[in-house]
Amino acid sequence: MLNKSFIVGAVSLCGLLGAGLVSQSALAATAAAPDLVAKYDKDSDQTLDLAEVKAAASAHFDKLDKNADGTLDAKEVQGVIGPQTFKAADPDNDGTLSKDEYLALVAKLFNKADTDHDGTLSAQELKSKTAHALKRLID
């Protein structure tokens, strides 16, 4: 009996801890949204358009390109782009992302995060899971 109670308690605790991690991630994305707008909103309209996001992504690409060869390999984007996303973003299958391929991924995520399809990302839209992935590509 004691062992069964212990196991049930441990499983419940793991569930609560897991829920806490999800909540912390959601809170971090929520807190980052206004900062992202403030940092990259060049026309001061309180939203990010695709041009603003691509400009930020282009600069971030250059920072990630440690060997300055104009492409990003899996090692250079470790922690930024997961292996499956990297493979999907590499249509020529050469094992690297050119700036055009990187910006195409950025545009794809931008369009997915733009839930009202107005061509901009509001602070609210920047709280989504997709926008959190987009943030890693621009900041």
Predicted regions and their residues:
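EF-hand Ca2+-binding helix-loop-helix modules
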Residues: 2-5, 20, 24-63, 74-88, ...
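Acidic carboxylate motifs that coordinate Ca2+ or other divalent cations, activating on Asp/Glu
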Residues: 41-45, 65-69, 90-94, 114-118, ...
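Bacterial N-terminal signal peptides
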Residues: 10-20
